[in-house]
C-alpha cells in the first residue's frame, strides 16, 4: 500500500511539472491498479501483498496521500476519467473521516491506524504527523474543487 501510494502521487507530480503525457498515462495505470486492490472502505492495507489480509493493518497515511493525489490527478483528465478518481478520493476521505479512523479526543492527531515502517516494527497502527498533513491537504483540495478552483493554491 505505502510504496504504491508514493509512486501514484509521484507520477502525478512529475506530470504536473513536465506536462509529458507519458507520466499522466503511467499515473493512471498505477492508480487503476491501486484502486482495484483497495478493500471495501477504500483505506489501504499497509502492504497489498500481506498474506494476513484481511487482518493486515491498514495504513491511513497511505490513504491520505493517495486521496490528495487523486484529487490533483482528476483535474488533468477528461470529466469521465477525472470524475472516477475524484469519486475514489471522496470515498477514501469519507472513510478517513469516520469514527473508525478519527482519533477524536484520544490523541493529539486526526488520524489513527497508520503504518510507518512495518519491517522495522516502527509506528504500527499509529498516528503519524504526515498522515494528518496529507489528510488536511486532501480536504483542502476537495474544498477548492467544490468551490470551482484548482487543487493547487
PLM region descriptions:
Residues 1-6:
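Short, small-residue-biased leader/transition segments that mark boundaries at the very start
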Amino acid at each position: 500500500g505505502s510504496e504504491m501510494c508514493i509512486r501514484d502521487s509521484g507520477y502525478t507530480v512529475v506530470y504536473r511539472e513536465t506536462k509529458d503525457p507519458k507520466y499522466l498515462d503511467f499515473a493512471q495505470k498505477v492508480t487503476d491498479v491501486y484502486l482495484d486492490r483497495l478493500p471495501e472502505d477504500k483505506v489501504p492495507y499497509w502492504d497489498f501483498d500481506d498474506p494476513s489480509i484481511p487482518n493486515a493493518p491498514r495504513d491511513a497515511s497511505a490513504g491520505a496521500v493517495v486521496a490528495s493525489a487523486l484529487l490533483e490527478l482528476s483535474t488533468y483528465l477528461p470529466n469521465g476519467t477525472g470524475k472516477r478518481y475524484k469519486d475514489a478520493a471522496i470515498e477514501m476521505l469519507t472513510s478517513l473521516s469516520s469514527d473508525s479512523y478519527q482519533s477524536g479526543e484520544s490523541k493529539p492527531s486526526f488520524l489513527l491506524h497508520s503504518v510507518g515502517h512495518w519491517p522495522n516494527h516502527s509506528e504500527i497502527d499509529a498516528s503519524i504527523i504526515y498522515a494528518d498533513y496529507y489528510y488536511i491537504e486532501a480536504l483542502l483540495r476537495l474544498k477548492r474543487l467544490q468551490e470551482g478552483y484548482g487543487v493547487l493554491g
